[in-house]
């Protein structure tokens, strides 16, 4: 009896404690990697039904703007991979709609889904002002034609020193020969140097972003023929008098070397994607060739071949590319004949060479290219290390364009270029005459002072109210010394997301973030009235936008914490750290119970960089905190403004139950290291970044993002622009 009374007394005491608000501490269980869930089948919807779908079959949800199609009795939601591919490969005329009409319809649906998914937050789209020394004549810039293009045709006034100093706030890295090698996108400044040192392209864009044949390099206009099997062949013949900067002759081999080498496992070993010839006939068989397995069959049923059927060398100055039927209907078909010459050793090594099948004229690469050696107990391709070394700016290889790199100072991020007297000029840029171009690093806070001291002659893409006003004032007061040119920017400054990791891997979180940044105010403050806001990846002056602006259905995400809370709660962000219902009066951060493919290994191990919040396991269920790890590039006035407008804004944090960490970073470490997860740029193997601010631009009239939304894991790391695999694109999600 005493024991029973004692138990009753203990129970009453416990009830009394709980009645006073004392709750039993929650017990977190260890994270179990075995609980992770991932897709096993990455077959895309587009690969399965894309060829069956025409634009007239598509249904558009008038409220959300999302697109659907029914094929063989199954209704599919069209994801980003599908729409980006259909936009450029499914544009055959339908009914009274032209190919352009069809393209515009796909483009609209693509923009609308992008707007729904919010893979990034456009913060401002501004006017750009290019400020330059008045000694420079004929400098004409446009949204598609930057100073690195314009300076080639420009001249220096007689009597002035025949040299120009270009400046950019984007760091140079020294990757001048192939600025995109091993990256998902090139560094803007590195790309400028690459443009200035490259030439003899078969195709070049003009000041309006339109592509035209470069007859300065071509012997005749390229031809195209649709073959009986639906493939399409482009035949290109170059002139016989083209030479590199060292005077060595350029032949057709130099035009096909890049596509050949970068479709092999050797280039992959050097850090390339290995997908340069992906759209060409015979790619799979050639890409599987290792140097010793010709004629074998891969585990995917592909017959390995030493020669690439889609690339042929017809004679010393004539070559052809044959595209598979899937890509024969490409909307921007002219670019299929685009090619540029490279020194053979750049990608083939000292002993590598292009070889030709005497019967078919198909190209391959010699045995020396595939040679291996022992390193650390493993067979490695010898040429892979040569490629890495040859890509350095100061390798002994020549350049093909109007300038050559004579020096690069990595400590000051300064490149010096000298005129290449052997380059005759081209149709787009003309012939260069400026003897020396120096490319320097600029910082917003000091660039105007450098300009007035003559330490830089051109400051490109000035933006921001204070900087713009200072530049215009300088020109107004000193018209004999300074000049400017300006244009509406085809692009925008943004807060980009890593959309496959942590809370920003979920659409509703990205929507909540865009709801809680007052973007019109941000744009007005930053640009000083010289800009506005866009709501997707488009240029308001583009033909597609102008054709669809009256019917496009996009959410402007007007500033509202209530709207943010609504989308979060609807998606399940309704818990606290104990797995109980979130109480905004006493809980700081919301949590979501993860399910399905949200239970990725990275999400199970997610935590804020300050270790304050992390995914927790309670009674077998996983709960993720609404914490965002933001990396802000510095020095950068956009970062400074985001600190106020977003990270330290109660409407974006405490009001909605979100926590935001801030990590200051330089551009290369933040973008390439943490965002792109490049170990060469400092990534340590542990995912951390959820958001980072940078910019995007549409530098050509060719609007093509096919493959940039791929769900193919073999292409994802190198091609994905926002690191998102749209669930609507997985064919397995529709299997009954």
Task: Show which residues each predicted segment covers.
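C-terminal motif of bacterial Sec signal peptides marking the signal peptidase cleavage site
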Residues: 16-19
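Detector for C-terminal structural segments
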Residues: 23-175, 184, 188, 516-551, ...
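Aromatic- and charge-enriched surface segment that lines or borders ligand/interaction sites
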Residues: 100-101, 220-285, 314, 320, ...
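Short, well-ordered beta-strand elements
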Residues: 161-171, 233-237, 255, 319-320, ...
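Append "and occasionally in soluble cytosolic enzymes with long acidic Gly/Pro-rich linkers
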Residues: 210-212, 224-225, 406, 416-418, ...
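Extracellular/periplasmic solute-recognition and catalytic clefts
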Residues: 268-279, 406-421, 438-501, 512, ...
